[in-house]
Every structure is written in structure tokens, then in C-alpha cells.
Amino acid sequence: MATAQLATFKLPAIENEPMYDYAPGSKERQHLQEALKTMRSQAPFEVPIIINGEEIRTGTTEAQLCPTDNKTTLCNFHTADPALTEKAIAGALAAKQQWEDMPFYDRLAIFMKAADLVSKKYRYEINAATMLGQGKNAWQAEIDSAAELCDFLRFNCKYAEDLYTQQPPKNSSGVWNRVEYRPLEGFVLAVSPFNFTAIGGNLAAAPALMGNVVVWKPAPAAVYSNYLIQKIFEEAGLPAGVVQFVPGPAPEIVGACLAHRDFASLHFTGSTHVFKSLWQKVGENIHKYRSYPRIVGETGGKNFHLIHSSADPKTVVPQSIRAAFEFQGQKCSALSRMYVPDNLWSEIKTLLVAEVAKIKVGDVADFTNFMTAVINKAAFDKIAKYIDFAKSSSDAEIICGGTYDDSKGYFIQPTVIVAKSPDFKTMTEEIFGPVVTIYVYPSKDFEKMYQVIQDTTEYALTGAIFAADRHAVKSATNGLRHAAGNFYVNDKCTGAVVGQQPFGGARGSGTNDKAGSINLLYRFVSVRTIKESFLPISGWSYPSNHE
């Protein structure tokens, strides 16, 4: 039975989670180092499937390796098959009505508590899992699995509260108009990536917050950190069945979900190719569904920095190094191509070569390493092929890096390529690694670069303009209006903060539903309009019907 709501509640003020800097000698650094040491000593962990609150061990397992030490297993996770996926769907649908009926502020309280558990009790553990399992250094883990995860959970609560207050602005005499924001009919399939622990949590939590039930398939290379999130949700009071944790082979799990009559939505972050294939499968199955599914996806990018002749090279170079090489270039938003005017090229090249040479690459336990390893062997091989292509081409020159070694971990040195043409292979294709390609253009052709940027890739995720000249800033902002969903002025193209810069792009980069904003939550509700009349009518005819 639903609980009567006897007051209109209001959330506490929501602020971005403060980030620890893990400076030498700090207690935070000591705690994180201890968490890393403990986790390494206890690994490998066993990760079950979780359906209806029950931990299921199938005996069929896969290993999540540590990218910086590919002989070390962080966890062995049990994998689901189509039958278990069907069980997860059935259990989610069985939990749906009670979850949907739970008073809104009780749902909010669960996710607000989850955020506090991440912030305090489990901060170091989930950061350590992200470092060991996904190859992030301490700072990159902190801004992801601690700060951004907390921000997603808390700001979504605030956005949901704001969303529910949106009501019709007008009522006729004797009429009360109102709308309610119903959960979708059916279940949401969340398919999450390896590169952000926080995104995994958000893909499951955002639709669940709005009263939906979720089948969550985590990426194999992020299973352990995502499993910790699932356990945090449970500790925070999330009822069994609301989020079903179903690791395993994508074709079997996703295939079973997309073929189900009650499939209501796909919440996806991953590659453009996979997203397109899933959308195509939804189209093929459209006749099976109870309702038209909501498809929400954030996918690939070929993100750019456009440098104007008025830019300050001492700003351009450090911003570009961070954008290209943080987390080994494995952010959806990472810098992958630069357009540099010829009048600045000599100075930028000198600075860039000198600074990139200072980047340390190595194990996550050494906090002085700016970069660690790429995620797995497949990624390593793909990136290495792009580097080898540039090495063998007469149309390109490698001025930094260009070496790689997977004998211990999947290590690739930060690599800078200079291409003779803006349509060179590494200027146009997504690499998803620590490789940035530069095209040096005649400074008089600045505005011509707008079309080049837009026409040479299918993506439109992030981009930046660097210029002191305000006319150039304005011109580029207008000329590149559709080239990036997140556009930066004199700042790097990475680092969107929840509650400050809603994130997402269009074209081949996704549906641009803007994670970290109220826009995303609208995708997981179905609006019902209610009109209530208080006055009776005197008859059925209208004045125009009378003589």
C-alpha cells in the first residue's frame, strides 16, 4: 500500500563533490595507497551475477585483467546466458509495480544515500578498483569513480525534483490541468563502457531513479568497479530486482533483451559501430514491442582543437597534452586532432615535443605516472596499427612517441603525428588511444578549417577553439555550431562536469541527450496529461448549434 505524502519535501542543496588531490604526504594519498595494496593482495575477486538480489554463480567465468600488469587478474566474473537474462527481465518486471509506486522522495533518498556511501565509506575502494581494473591513475580515478559518480547520483535527484514540478501553466475556469511523469512500460537495458566507472553507475541509476527497472550489462573490462556500485546500491536500500546486474557476452544478453516484448529503452555508452548495430536490431524487432523504445546513446568522437593565429602557445600546449593523453586518450571526449596555423607551428612544436617528453608512463601504484596502460590487448593492437601506418606513410611524420610494448602491460607512449593532409587516416578515424594528429594550415585559411573539421569525420562530440581574437572566437563558435555537442573556448575539449557542462554530441557521436542534465531524465519518463473538471455542463450542444 502506498504511503500518504503529508508534505512537499525539498532536497538539500546539491553541490559538486569535492575532489581529493592526493598530494604527497596527504592522508588521502596514504589511504588510497593502502586500498591499492589491500586490493592487490586479495585479488582475484569472484564476481557473481545478481538477479532479484540473489548472487548467481554459473561456473562459466571470464577474467578482468589489470591493464598495467596483464598477467594479473583483478576478478573472475560469472557470465549469464539467454536463460538467465530472461530470468533477470522477468524479475525486473515483477519488481516494477512496487518500485514505481514507491513515493518519489523515498526513491531519491536511496540514491542520495548511495552517493554518500561512495563519497565516504567506499571512496578509496572504488577508486582502487578503477585504477587496477581500468588503468586510471589516482587523479583520473578520483574525478571519475568518486566525484563524477557522486555528482551523477545527487544532481539526478535534483533534476528529477525539478522535472516533477513542471506543470501546465494555464487552467480554465473550473478545471485543474496537471501532468505526471510515468516510468516507461517495460524495462530499460543499460549497456555500459569500460572507460568511466561513473557512467556505468549513471546508465543504471538515472532510469531507475525515475521509477524504471533496469537490466545492467557492464563492460567486461570494468566489471569489478561496476559490481561495487551494484553492492552500494543494495546497501543504500535499492529493492531487489530494480537493477539486475548481468555481466556476460553481449550478443546473448543484449540479444535476449532486444527481442523481448517489454523492452522499453536502451541506455548505452560505447562505440558508434555497436550502437548503430543495436539500433538496427531494434528496428528489425519493432513489431514485437509494446511501445516504441527510447534509444539513448553516447558513442564515439574525433575531437578537435582549432588553434587561431592569435592563440597563446603556452596555453594551447598544456591544454592539448591533458586533452590528448589523460587516461591514455581513452575518454570519449579525448583530443585526437589539432589544426595549427603555420605562423604558430614552430613555437607550438618546440613546446609540445619538450613537454610530451616529460610524461611518465607506468603502473597505477606510482602516482607520478601521468599515463598508464590502455585497456586490453585488442585496444593495444588497434592503436599500434595506426601508429605503424603513420610510420610507414610518406604523408605523415611522428614527432613524439610512436613506440609501444605489451610484454608486461599494454603500454603505448604518447604519440604526436604531423599529417600533410587534413584527410589523413589518423586525422579522420577514431583511434581511442594516446595518439593525436596535427595538421598545419595556412593562417589565412582559418575559416576554411570549419568545413574541413566537419566534413572529414562522422562525429560531433567535443571540440575547442583557442584564440585571443574575439572575432575569431565568435566566428568559430558560429561556424562550428554543429561540429561538437560540447564546445570549449580557450579550454581543453575534455572534462565536462555534471551540473556545469551537460555532456553529449550528435551525428555519429550519439543522441545528444546530455548526461548530467535534466534532459536525460525526460527520456525515461512517459508523460500523462490529466484534466479534472469541477463544474457540471448543462447540456451537450454548443451555442453555434442553436437557431
Residue ranges and their predicted role:
Residues 232-237, 259-261, 265, 273-422, ...:
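ALDH superfamily catalytic-core signature
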Residues 159, 191, 249, 269, ...:
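Conserved residues at the C-terminal ends of beta-strands
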Residues 131, 150, 158-315, 512:
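Rossmann-like NAD(P) dinucleotide-binding subdomain of oxidoreductase/dehydrogenase enzymes
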Residues 82-93, 97-98, 108-124, 134-165, ...:
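Long amphipathic alpha-helix in the N-terminal Rossmann-like dinucleotide-binding domain
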